[in-house]
């Protein structure tokens, strides 16, 4: 009887359980990014006899990764003469203009020289540009245009 009981107890007891573990490493690499949008600067209508400069504005909206350092830069446009920005009527006539980063138009942004330093917030950031066409320019009537390339370096 004892042998039968021992055999029955041995069969009824569960085998010792075993547990194994493993690790899964989880990673991601976030790379800095910037997206840019611009608005046109339109000076409207202008006569060379106006007593004050003609003024215009434009916005550059940048969305850069959080804490990403970046700079905004402007080239001289299609018709620059050295550091002087110019719009052309396509017939060899030019209207001078400048772009500044302040409403008083004293902090001029020289082509490919002056950069606007910023730090990304991960949200859209608007940088307003302030344009000025000096009065007293003696040019033929017509439509004058230019195209500026905006560069974001990050």
Residue ranges of each PLM-predicted region?
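N-terminal signal peptide c-region/cleavage motif recognized by signal peptidases
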Residues: 10-14
């Amino acid at each position: 009887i004892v042998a039968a009981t021992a055999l029955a107890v041995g069969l009824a007891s569960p085998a010792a359980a075993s547990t194994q573990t493993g690790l899964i490493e989880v990673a991601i690499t976030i790379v800095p990014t910037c997206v840019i949008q611009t608005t046109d600067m339109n000076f409207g209508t202008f006569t060379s006899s106006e007593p004050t400069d003609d003024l215009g504005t434009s916005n550059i909206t940048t969305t850069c990764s959080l804490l990403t350092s970046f700079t905004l830069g402007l080239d001289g446009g299609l018709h620059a003469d050295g550091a002087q920005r110019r719009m052309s009527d396509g017939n060899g006539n030019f209207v001078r203009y400048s772009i500044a980063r302040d409403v008083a138009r004293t902090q001029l942004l020289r082509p490919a020289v002056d950069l606007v330093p910023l730090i990304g917030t991960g949200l859209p950031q608007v940088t307003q540009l302030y344009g000025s066409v000096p009065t007293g320019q003696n040019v033929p009537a017509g439509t004058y245009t230019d195209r500026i390339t905006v560069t974001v370096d990050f």
